[in-house]
Amino acid sequence: MYKKSKKEIKNIRVNILKKTYEANSSHIGSCYSVVEILYALYFLKLKKKDTFILSKGHAALAQYCTLFEKKILSKASLDSYGKNNTNLMAHVSHKVKGVEFSTGSLGHGLPYAVGKALGEKINKSKSKIYVLISDGELNEGTTWESLLFASFHKLDNLFIIIDYNKIQSLDFVKNVLKIEPLKQKLTSFNCNVSQIDGHNINQIIKSLKSKKNNKPNIIIANT
């Protein structure tokens, strides 16, 4: 594992727990399932010209705690989580420093990311667009429409990470709407698909480097 990562990841997890307890509000399971993914992006991958969208906005606290560990958010700002008149609520807001796009209602982050990726490609920019979605968002029609669009326009500057924790708010994913065989379905959309351990930093970074020309990149992160 990368140097310092264990300590920083632990700090992020501890702060998620602390703020959940203090505010009595958080989707803590959804937050914990993406910690290593957020760490890999913010600490090891994202460049200034790149864009990250957290489509599963209910994992807002994980993003806030990562931004704090990265020293983008102040302690005073993080301490305001869940309090009156704060911008740091249980669903992510673009009013928070370091956040690109407000999300919460599932299925909206990926369409935005696809549009952003198309715009960057038209402008011949070298920037990359990263979007983290939940497996529950695979129940949304907008997700599959966006994948069709991204594939048609050959958006190889787009990296879609699926937090495959296999559970939704009310039940396991397989009991709500079966999405398997997931990798085969996504590959059939002419996407570059890999499947990894979503808590393994080395696997996350390796998969983010596995880019193919003219194909959107999808990482199924088992968490």
Where are these regions (language model features)?
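Non-catalytic, mobile gating and regulatory segments of ester bond hydrolases
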Residues: M1-K4
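N-terminal capping segment at the start of a domain
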Residues: I9-S25, D163-N165
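Cofactor-binding active-site loop characterized by glycine-rich and histidine/acidic residues
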Residues: S26, C31-E145, S151-F152
